[in-house]
Amino acid sequence: MNIKIGVVCGSFHRSEVERMLEWSTDEADRQGIEIEDVIWVPGAMEVPLALDRLLSRDDIEGAACLGIIEKGQTQHGLAMGHAVIKSIIELQIVHEKPIGLGIIGPGAAPEHIGPRLEPHARAAVGAVVAMSE
């Protein structure tokens, strides 16, 4: 498969997301697709705009987004997570290009993050591949 994708990474949990990016890159290599561009954004709220810009490009055929939305002391993360995921779904439909969701949470407790890094990263790329066939 000869497709080019972009990856949007949330930098709030940079060290964890850098590891996710490594696994996503490995999965892209395994699947025979190319990561054409990586965009780092401050957090989850900026992911939809970065995805929109990526998917507007003719050379990008899909995208993956990687990040973490932790459980906080208020409902802020949950509300934000729902809004971001809704926007991501809408962007897939508008651009007719697949987006793989590799955002852990919302509501992830610290002990849940580590075990989910690799599976979420690989699954995000896998979803783009599956929907590109």
For the regions a protein language model found, what residue spans apply to each?
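Short, acidic/small-residue loops that bind anionic groups at enzyme active sites
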Residues: 80-105, 123
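A charged, well-structured terminal subsegment
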Residues: 118-133
